[in-house]
Amino acid sequence: MRVIDYGRLLLLAALWGASFLFMRITTPAFGALNSAFLRVLFAAIALGLLLGVQGKWSGYQGKFTSTLQLGVINSGLPFLMYCLAAQWLPAGYSATLNATAPMMGVLIGALCFAEPLTLRKGGGAILGAIGVAVIARPTSGLSAALLLPGIGACLTATACYGLAGFLTRRWIQQRGGLEAERVALGSQVGATLFLFPFFLWSCWHGPAVDWRQSLPWIAIVMLGVVCTAAGYII
C-alpha cells in the first residue's frame, strides 16, 4: 500500500476508536435506541448534503435498494449493538472487541460463502482471537452480569460487519460497482429507516429523556457526522 493508504487507515482507526467514547456519553443520556437512530440520521443528513453539493443524488444504477438493505447489516444492527454494549462495557472493551471483525469475516466466509479457509486465514483468526482475549480480560470491577451481554452485543456487531463485506461484494461490486459516497448514503438511509420504529417506540414507551442536554447532542453529532459519515467515505 501507499503511504497515503496507511494514513487513511490510521485516521479511520482513530475515528472508530473515538466513536466508542462518544457512545459512552450519548447512551446514558439518550438511551441505546435513541443514540443508534440519531447517529445514522445525522450521518445520512451529512452524506445527503455532500452528495447534493456534488450533484450525485442519482446514478445508483439500480443498486439503491441493495444499499438500503446493506445499511441494515453494516450500520443499523451494529450501531444498535454497540450502543447497547455501551450500557455495560467501558469504551476500551468495545473498541478491543471491534477488532474481531476480520475473524468474523473469515468464519462467515468459510461457513456461508464457501470461501477457502487457508492456513494463513485460520492462523490469523486464531491469533486475533487470542490477542483480543488477552487485552480484554475481565477486571475485578466488572461483573459477569455486565460483561457477558456486552461481549455478546459487540460480537453480534462484528459478525454483521463480517457478513456485510461479502454482501457488498455480491450486491455492489459484482454488479458493476458503485462510488463509496453513494454506498455510504444508501446504507445510512437504510439504517435510519430500520431504526426509526425503534426510536418511536423508545420515545413513547422508554425511559424519559432530557433532550436539553448540550454535551450529548455535541457527542451524537460528532458520532454521526465525523465518526460515521466521514468514516464510511475515507
Language-model segments: which ranges?
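Juxtamembrane helix-entry segments on the extracytoplasmic side of multipass membrane proteins
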Residues: 1-6, 29-33, 37, 59-65, ...
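Cytoplasmic-side transmembrane-helix entry/capping segments in multi-pass membrane proteins
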Residues: 9, 62-72, 117-130, 150-151, ...
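Juxtamembrane helix-loop-helix junctions in multi-pass membrane proteins
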Residues: 14-44, 90, 163-191
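Specific transmembrane alpha-helical segments of multi-pass solute transporters/efflux pumps
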Residues: 15-20, 48-98, 134, 224-234
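Alpha-helical transmembrane segments of compact multi-pass small-molecule transporters, enriched
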Residues: 19, 41-46, 97-111, 126, ...
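Membrane-interface helix caps of multi-pass small-molecule transporters
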Residues: 25, 49-52, 84, 88, ...
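Transmembrane alpha-helical segments that form core, pore/gating elements
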Residues: 47, 105-106, 143-206
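Hydrophobic transmembrane alpha-helices of multi-pass small-molecule transport proteins
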Residues: 47, 108, 117-139, 195
